[in-house]
Amino acid sequence: MKKFTITLALSILAVLLVATPCNAKGKAKHVVLIGLDGWGAYSVPKADIPTIKQLMADGAYTLEKRSALPSSSAINWASMFMGAGPELHGYTQWGSKTPELPSRELNQHGIFPTIFQLLRDAQPEAEIGCLYEWDGIKYLVDTLSLSHYAQAPDYNKHPEALCTMAETYIKKKQPALLAVCFDNPDHVGHQAGHNTPEYYAKLKELDT
């Protein structure tokens, strides 16, 4: 997971698809944000991902979004959760657990503001969760703002574990906001190569 090659803004795609327009009569009660580490926009046209492509057709997306630099994991996950680049949040390394540079702003928990904390401030009783494969995620999400967070156990041997966890949590708690963060296709990309048959097989698996 040394590179975070998502140039595709599908980590926020779920938010864009689930959320309704600001002037709509009703607003979304539940938002699920799904992130796939190492997913390059170049793969979308030839990838066998009918579910995702249908979501794209029905919602909003971009294939032009670039990674924050340097293009590695903690920096980019932080940038998405915090809505700011590394020059503001201060996370500058692949496995950053705390900012290498002083954050320009700190919330009440001593971390750069996140989408999770903003929702917590607005809705103190909201159920807010984050489920992930890569353990580094927990350092970037302001866990004090979360109702629940957990890592999928032994996920390389049990790739279905995170999906099972998310399904159980959604059915039981019906969270207002949930982030589900996959380590793949990045892990496969490092092992077998990006833009390889193995890489596209993993994308197809994740689409289902």
Regions found by a protein language model. Give the residues of each.
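A long, amphipathic alpha-helix that forms part
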Residues: 26, 160-164, 178, 186-208
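Second-shell loop/turn segments in exported
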Residues: 38-43, 66-67, 100-107, 117, ...
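Bacterial Sec-dependent N-terminal signal peptides
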Residues: 1-27
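Structural recognition of the beta-strand scaffold that forms the well-ordered cores
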Residues: 31-35, 62-66, 79-81, 118, ...
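Extracytoplasmic/secreted cell-surface and envelope-processing proteins
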Residues: 42-45, 138-142, 187-192
